[in-house]
UniProtKB/Swiss-Prot annotation:
A biological process from GO: transcription antitermination
Family that this chain belongs to: Belongs to the NusB family.
Protein name, as recorded: Transcription antitermination protein NusB
Signal peptide: none
CDD domains listed in its UniProt record: Terminator_NusB
Pfam families per the UniProt record, alphabetical: NusB
Source species: Mycobacterium bovis (strain ATCC BAA-935 / AF2122/97)
A cellular-component GO term for this protein: cytosol
HAMAP family the record matches: NusB
Disulfides per UniProt: none
Free-text function comment from the UniProt entry: Involved in transcription antitermination. Required for transcription of ribosomal RNA (rRNA) genes. Binds specifically to the boxA antiterminator sequence of the ribosomal RNA (rrn) operons.
Keyword Metal-binding: no
Entry superkingdom: Bacteria
GO molecular function, one term: RNA binding
Length: 156
């Protein structure tokens, strides 16, 4: 058995995805580009850890569906615009909305709980309640959005 501990599950993978989205926004590039850069760096330098597969999947998924995710978040903001939110809150919401829409193996309450926990760890005192409220509203429409996406994929 190896002494090297694996990444601590999906919570750490989500946290790293939030970090990557934040970095991408600051650098003005897509999260997928950041993932590609990190993968190349880990390949070139064996002492640099590879990204957790879930981190890469989330970051690439958010990049691929960015417009839809941002539209969905914006539709559920009350008294705020997406660009006025703290950048870390935007990243947390984007990761969480992607999971609500595309991570069928993650129960919705787990997605919200993880987002609130990340907001507690990474953002302002008001952010956990705000994130919880926005995601609670998004959760009301995700079953219909998932069903519509499935119908499109299934050719129906």
């Amino acid at each position: 058995m190896s002494d090297r501990k694996p990444v601590r599950g999906r919570h750490q993978a989500r946290k790293r995805a939030v970090d990557l989205l934040f970095e991408a926004e600051v650098r003005g590039i897509s999260a997928a580009e950041v993932v590609d850069t990190r993968a190349a760096l880990a390949e070139a330098k064996p002492d640099i850890a590879r990204l957790h597969p879930y981190t890469a999947a989330v970051a690439r998924g958010v990049s691929e569906h960015a417009a839809h995710i941002d539209d969905l978040i914006t539709a559920h903001l009350r008294g705020w615009t997406l660009d006025r939110l703290p950048a870390v809150d935007r990243a947390i919401l984007r990761v969480s909305v992607w999971e609500l829409l595309h991570a069928a193996d993650v129960p919705e309450p787990v997605v919200v709980d993880e987002a609130v926990q990340l907001a507690k760890e990474l953002s302002t005192d008001d952010s956990p309640g705000f994130v919880n409220g926005v995601l609670g509203q998004v959760m009301l429409v995700t079953p219909q959005l998932r069903a519509a996406a499935q119908a499109v994929r299934g050719g129906a």
